[in-house]
Amino acid sequence: IGDIMKEKVLLLLKEGEYISGEKLSEILGVSRTAIWKAINSLRDDGYEIDSVTNKGYKLVKKPNVLNASTISEGLNVKVVGTEIITLKTVDSTNEEIKRKAHENARSGLVVISCEQTAGKGRLGRKWASNEGGVYFSFLLRPELPPSDVSGITLAAGLGVCLAIRKFTGLDAKIKWPNDVIVGNKKICGILTEMTAQTDMVDFVVIGIGINVLQESFPEEIAYKATSLKIETKSEPDLSELMHEIIATLDKTILSYLFGISQDDLKLYKSMCATIGREVSLVRNGEKLTGKAIDITADGELVVCLENGKKIAVNSGEVTVQGIY
């Protein structure tokens, strides 16, 4: 039974009242047997469907899974989420997007999965794709020189942070340049990768991993990781959460593509937990310490060193006192 048929049956079952197999087959123009197979396939996917003789079928409970049609329902997007693909498992959503990009996929494609078998973090590190997380990447083909791409991680961090705040009410903050935190613990990481010619970007892939349903973490990361479920003491609906995140990312990325506005920069700074804290970093082999005081429009962190000199840091390892 095809996924499209299952989706169609599911949409008709959503009403919360009984609908007969006969009516379903009439509306969809398929046999009663095809309907029965689709119902059983949905049950295998975790949908609780009641069936009563002479009454038909009724959806009792949906499983908390990623559903592309639920995510895109009512979405009015321009640059992120113009096409959405959900996968049960994947090696890495960034790698999947790169493969699609080489097959000429259009800008705006989003790939989402609850399992990555070979997820990766910054500097090529292995990213622990714990069960309970949601991992997604999106494709952009901006007509920009490579030097203008650095601020894109800022726009993505801002979008995710705003969406988490709106969806959960949590006081999420941004740890420059690419993490979202709640109460000084990491809830989200962002990895931006780019393929470019000398003077023009071919495509950009932004990968985002969010801790959603985890109830605990391995001992070695428990002190620095948390999840939406731990923080809200409830279970967020994955598809509704992704709907909110994609809708918000579309706005912040669109704004970035037109040149990050002063308002967005102000908003980012107000939610950035790094500003005002003591930081240490390594530059040209030398360890430097100072205070993070600002973020530039290009997404650089401005640090006032102990000797009073101000430097702009564009990436690399910055350790922030008080945050993992």
PLM features per residue range, with description:
Residues D50, A172-K173:
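A local structural micro-motif
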Residues K6-R165, C188:
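N-terminal lobe of the biotin/lipoate ligase/transferase fold
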Residues G2-K23, I27-V30, N40, D44-D45, ...:
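Long, positively charged amphipathic alpha-helical accessory segments at protein N-termini or as interdomain linkers
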